[in-house]
A protein has these predicted regions:
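Serine-esterase "nucleophile elbow" of acetyl-processing enzymes
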Residues: 1-40
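Loop/turn elements at helix/coil->beta-strand transitions in domains of secreted/extracellular proteins
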Residues: 1-2, 29-35, 80-86, 127-135, ...
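Active-site-proximal beta-strand/loop segments in catalytic clefts of secreted hydrolases
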Residues: 6-9, 37-43, 87-92, 137-141, ...
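Well-ordered, non-membrane alpha-helical segments in soluble/globular domains
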Residues: 19-21, 63-72, 106-122, 151-162
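A short beta-strand-loop structural module common to alpha/beta enzyme folds
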Residues: 26-64
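Oxyanion-hole/transition-state-stabilizing segment in secreted/luminal serine hydrolases
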Residues: 59-112, 139-144
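Active-site segments of SGNH/GDSL-like serine hydrolases
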Residues: 91, 123-157
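Catalytic His-Asp segment of secreted/periplasmic serine-dependent ester chemistry enzymes
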Residues: 142-244
Length: 245
């Protein structure tokens, strides 16, 4: 079972929180062969350091096909190599502007009206790869010192929609509610989970707390529990007791 985790810096923090070690321990205990690897997507050059809804739509839907787009792999390429593909957005995704009333799927503007069109097209595209399971993180949140109340509320509303509406049971798409873990039900990333009041990267301690939950979510999806255990547990202070659980 080959698993790919596509990420930028927030995902790297969680990866370094113990993801490879968790899977090594799980495989040893359960005699499974779940092989996970990670990759920056998209890269800084030539595409650019942008992994927002527009960018997944741009690479995987608009420019779909058997060849890379600006050196980035399309779904046609990735699904030949991986059984499970996990992808996410970094925290600037939560810098959401007000809607204009004129949604545009090809717009880079961070607005709910555009995000929903891009997500709808992505869902249709992901559904076409029936032999691959996809796990989408709800977006990384911003600290209160890094955003406005209105923007934070729009982010909370959008990712609730992703979890409760966009993610349909019974298909090959699943979510992991990272936004909820970071915010604990508020619209802001908790300062205690962040690298700093104005730095919305997860702290090393928080990354170690949530890494086992991320790993367990992947295993639940692989083993057929993806629609049963949809909501993450609260972060644990200890990582080791999750290994092999």
């Amino acid at each position: 079972m080959n698993i790919l985790f596509l990420h930028h810096s927030t995902g790297e923090c969680v990866w370094k929180g113990g993801v490879p070690e968790w899977f090594a321990a799980y495989n040893a205990r359960h005699q499974t062969d779940y092989r996970i690897t990670e990759s920056i997507f998209p890269k800084k050059r030539p595409y650019g350091w942008k992994n927002y809804p527009y960018d997944y739509w741009n690479i995987w839907v608009k420019n779909a096909g058997p060849t890379p787009f600006l050196e980035e792999p399309t779904l046609e390429i990735l699904t030949r190599q991986y059984d499970v593909i996990v992808f996410k957005h970094c925290f600037p995704v939560s810098e959401i502007l007000p809607d204009t009333g004129v949604p545009d799927i090809s717009s880079k503007d961070k607005r709910i009206e555009n995000y929903k069109l891009q997500y709808a097209a992505l869902r249709e595209r992901l559904h076409s790869f029936t032999d691959t399971r996809f796990i989408v993180w709800t977006g990384a949140a911003l600290t209160e010192g890094s955003t406005s109340p209105d923007s934070a509320r729009r982010a909370a509303d959008f990712f609730k929609w992703v979890r409760d509406v966009w993610d349909e049971p019974g298909d090959n798409i699943f979510t992991w509610d990272f936004f909820d873990l970071e915010t604990e039900g508020s619209p802001y990333m908790k300062d205690g989970h962040a690298a700093g009041p104005y730095d919305s990267h997860p702290s090393p301690a928080f990354s170690r707390q949530v890494a086992p939950l991320f790993c367990q979510r992947i295993v639940d999806v692989i083993e057929g529990r993806g629609d049963v255990d949809r909501l993450p547990q609260a972060p644990s202070e200890e990582v080791s007791h999750h290994f092999g659980s």
